[in-house]
Amino acid sequence: MLSLFADQEREAKLDSLGDPLALLDKHVDFAALAAEIDRWAPWPSRAKGGRPPYPTELMTRLLVLQQLFNLSDEQMEFQLLDRMNFQRFAELKHSGRVPDRNTIWVFRERLVQANVEHQVFAEVQRQLQ
Protein backbone atom coordinates (compact mmCIF):
# COMPACT_ATOMS: atom_id res chain seq x y z
CA MET A 1 0.00 0.00 0.00
CA LEU A 2 1.28 3.46 -0.91
CA SER A 3 1.59 5.93 1.94
CA LEU A 4 2.80 9.51 2.11
CA PHE A 5 4.02 8.81 5.62
CA ALA A 6 5.82 5.51 4.96
CA ASP A 7 9.20 6.75 6.20
CA GLN A 8 7.71 8.11 9.41
CA GLU A 9 5.79 4.90 9.95
CA ARG A 10 8.95 2.82 9.47
CA GLU A 11 10.88 5.05 11.87
CA ALA A 12 8.17 4.69 14.49
CA LYS A 13 8.25 0.91 14.02
CA LEU A 14 12.05 0.87 14.38
CA ASP A 15 11.75 2.88 17.59
CA SER A 16 9.04 0.61 18.97
CA LEU A 17 11.20 -2.45 18.27
CA GLY A 18 14.13 -0.89 20.11
CA ASP A 19 16.60 0.22 17.44
CA PRO A 20 20.02 -0.36 19.06
CA LEU A 21 21.55 2.44 17.00
CA ALA A 22 19.07 4.92 18.48
CA LEU A 23 20.21 3.80 21.94
CA LEU A 24 23.85 4.18 20.95
CA ASP A 25 23.13 7.66 19.63
CA LYS A 26 21.43 8.54 22.91
CA HIS A 27 24.36 7.41 25.08
CA VAL A 28 27.41 8.56 23.09
CA ASP A 29 28.18 12.26 22.66
CA PHE A 30 29.41 12.13 19.08
CA ALA A 31 29.77 15.92 18.83
CA ALA A 32 32.21 15.98 21.76
CA LEU A 33 34.04 12.95 20.39
CA ALA A 34 34.38 14.65 16.99
CA ALA A 35 35.83 17.74 18.66
CA GLU A 36 38.39 15.53 20.41
CA ILE A 37 39.29 13.82 17.13
CA ASP A 38 39.82 17.19 15.45
CA ARG A 39 42.13 18.09 18.31
CA TRP A 40 44.01 14.76 18.23
CA ALA A 41 44.21 14.49 14.44
CA PRO A 42 43.55 17.82 12.70
CA TRP A 43 42.53 17.82 9.06
CA PRO A 44 45.47 18.47 6.74
CA SER A 45 45.76 21.88 5.13
CA ARG A 46 43.36 22.55 2.28
CA ALA A 47 45.75 24.96 0.57
CA LYS A 48 45.70 22.79 -2.56
CA GLY A 49 41.91 23.04 -2.79
CA GLY A 50 39.62 20.09 -3.31
CA ARG A 51 36.23 19.13 -1.99
CA PRO A 52 35.56 20.09 1.63
CA PRO A 53 35.69 17.08 3.96
CA TYR A 54 32.57 15.55 5.46
CA PRO A 55 32.05 16.59 9.09
CA THR A 56 34.16 14.69 11.60
CA GLU A 57 31.07 13.73 13.59
CA LEU A 58 29.52 12.00 10.58
CA MET A 59 32.73 10.15 9.76
CA THR A 60 33.12 9.07 13.40
CA ARG A 61 29.61 7.64 13.36
CA LEU A 62 30.52 5.67 10.24
CA LEU A 63 33.65 4.23 11.86
CA VAL A 64 31.61 3.13 14.85
CA LEU A 65 29.08 1.46 12.54
CA GLN A 66 31.88 -0.28 10.68
CA GLN A 67 33.34 -1.58 13.90
CA LEU A 68 30.01 -2.73 15.33
CA PHE A 69 28.92 -4.53 12.18
CA ASN A 70 32.37 -5.61 10.97
CA LEU A 71 31.97 -3.90 7.59
CA SER A 72 34.54 -3.20 4.92
CA ASP A 73 34.66 0.28 3.41
CA GLU A 74 32.79 -1.03 0.36
CA GLN A 75 30.10 -2.62 2.51
CA MET A 76 29.81 0.52 4.64
CA GLU A 77 29.08 2.56 1.52
CA PHE A 78 26.49 0.01 0.37
CA GLN A 79 24.80 -0.24 3.78
CA LEU A 80 24.59 3.55 4.05
CA LEU A 81 22.68 3.62 0.78
CA ASP A 82 20.52 0.64 1.71
CA ARG A 83 19.68 0.68 5.43
CA MET A 84 17.32 3.19 6.94
CA ASN A 85 18.66 2.83 10.48
CA PHE A 86 22.24 3.44 9.27
CA GLN A 87 21.10 6.57 7.43
CA ARG A 88 19.26 7.78 10.50
CA PHE A 89 22.18 7.05 12.84
CA ALA A 90 24.63 8.80 10.51
CA GLU A 91 22.21 11.72 10.13
CA LEU A 92 22.15 11.21 6.35
CA LYS A 93 18.46 10.42 5.99
CA HIS A 94 17.68 13.47 3.87
CA SER A 95 21.09 13.84 2.27
CA GLY A 96 21.74 13.35 -1.41
CA ARG A 97 25.43 12.71 -0.74
CA VAL A 98 26.84 9.72 1.10
CA PRO A 99 30.56 9.27 1.82
CA ASP A 100 32.05 6.72 -0.53
CA ARG A 101 34.50 3.94 0.32
CA ASN A 102 37.54 6.10 -0.44
CA THR A 103 36.33 8.92 1.79
CA ILE A 104 35.78 6.46 4.63
CA TRP A 105 39.26 5.00 4.10
CA VAL A 106 40.90 8.46 4.06
CA PHE A 107 39.22 9.40 7.34
CA ARG A 108 40.27 6.19 9.07
CA GLU A 109 43.79 6.59 7.68
CA ARG A 110 43.89 10.11 9.19
CA LEU A 111 43.25 8.55 12.60
CA VAL A 112 45.75 5.73 12.03
CA GLN A 113 48.47 8.18 10.96
CA ALA A 114 47.87 10.23 14.12
CA ASN A 115 47.86 6.99 16.14
CA VAL A 116 44.48 7.78 17.72
CA GLU A 117 42.15 5.20 16.16
CA HIS A 118 42.13 3.10 19.34
CA GLN A 119 41.50 6.19 21.47
CA VAL A 120 38.30 6.85 19.54
CA PHE A 121 36.89 3.41 20.29
CA ALA A 122 38.12 3.55 23.88
CA GLU A 123 36.21 6.82 24.33
CA VAL A 124 33.04 5.28 22.88
CA GLN A 125 33.42 2.36 25.31
CA ARG A 126 33.98 4.74 28.21
CA GLN A 127 30.82 6.70 27.40
CA LEU A 128 28.78 3.51 27.17
CA GLN A 129 29.79 2.33 30.65
Set out the residue ranges of the language-model regions.
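Charged, often Cys/His-bearing segments associated with DNA-binding zinc-finger transcription factors
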Residues: 1-39
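Secondary-structure capping and boundary motifs in well-ordered enzyme cores
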Residues: 13, 29, 50-58, 96-100
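Short, conserved catalytic/metal-binding motifs centered on acidic residues
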Residues: 19, 62, 76, 100-104
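Generic alpha-helical secondary-structure signal
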Residues: 36, 79, 106-107
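Short, Lys/Arg-enriched N-terminal segment that forms or immediately precedes the first helix
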Residues: 38-51
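Alpha-helical support elements that line or immediately flank enzyme active sites
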Residues: 58-70
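DNA-recognition alpha helix
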Residues: 75-87
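Active-site- or DNA-interface-adjacent structural scaffold in DNA-acting proteins
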Residues: 89-129
